[in-house]
Swiss-Prot record:
Gene3D superfamilies: Vaccinia Virus protein VP39 (3.40.50.150). It comes from Pyrococcus horikoshii (strain ATCC 700860 / DSM 12428 / JCM 9974 / NBRC 100139 / OT-3). Catalyzes the methyl esterification of L-isoaspartyl residues in peptides and proteins that result from spontaneous decomposition of normal L-aspartyl and L-asparaginyl residues. It plays a role in the repair and/or degradation of damaged proteins. This is Protein-L-isoaspartate O-methyltransferase. Its EC number is 2.1.1.77. The active site is at S65. Keywords: Cytoplasm, Methyltransferase, S-adenosyl-L-methionine, Transferase.
Length: 220
């Protein structure tokens, strides 16, 4: 198995490549990627592949997204210190760790699979991330107790934009969500809530995510 130094060197090269390709655009996203390397959020047998720009398996038949995809979503979200952010679909905990590093405050992340709640909590603890709160529940309903949010980032594909998530945004807030078919193809939408409560949608092109299962997502 590669040692930590080797893993980090490979990870640094991935970050440099994403920068050179114009995918990582901001210093804050670059800093977060360097502070929270992906190999801390996968099982030991996948650590040596963590620098590869592709999704990797995590427990319960789910995946950790490719680094370029995570960077794209974070750049669209344009997070700032002090923002109140909800993540839907904790998975490995990596994306939540990156968000927490950028906003420098508490981040709430919902996961519906108990095994992944435990997996993410272990990963976050190992990575020394203390400001991510992982909640077991149906992420398609959002998390009203800590709303309204400046941003909601959804890491699973929905059949349509879930109403509760829009309702839980602050005016001027952003929802980043893949919307489309069950498994194969979605479009990455940036949903901006206007001051009057109406929404403006920007389409950032085709993506492929695991399905968002829940009351306002897909049925199992």
């Amino acid at each position: 198995m590669m040692d930590e130094k080797e893993l980090y060197e490979k990870w640094k090269r991935t970050v440099e490549m994403l920068k050179a390709e114009g995918i990582i655009k901001s210093e804050k996203v670059e800093r977060a990627f360097l502070k929270c390397p992906r190999y801390l959020f996968v099982e030991d047998r996948y650590k040596k592949y963590a620098h590869v720009d592709e999704p990797l398996p995590i427990p319960a038949g789910q995946t950790i997204s490719a680094p370029h995809m995570v960077a794209i979503m974070l750049e669209i979200a344009d997070l700032k210190p002090g923002m109140n952010v909800l993540e839907v679909g904790t998975g490995s905990g990596w994306n939540a760790a990156l968000i927490a590093e950028i906003v420098k405050g508490d981040v709430y992340s919902i996961e519906r699979i108990p095994e992944l709640v435990e997996f993410a909590k272990r990963n976050l603890e190992r990575a020394g991330v203390k400001n991510v709160h992982v909640i077991l529940g149906d992420g398609s309903k959002g998390f009203p107790p800590k709303s309204p949010y400046d941003a909601i980032i959804v890491t699973a594909g929905a059949p349509e934009i879930p109403k509760p998530l829009v309702e839980q945004l602050k005016p001027g807030g952003k929802l980043i969500i893949p919307v489309g078919s069950y498994h194969l193809w979605q479009e990455l939408l940036e949903v901006i809530k206007r001051e009057d409560g109406s929404i403006k949608i920007k389409n950032h092109g085709g993506v492929a995510f695991v399905p968002l299962i829940g009351e306002h997502g897909w049925r199992e």
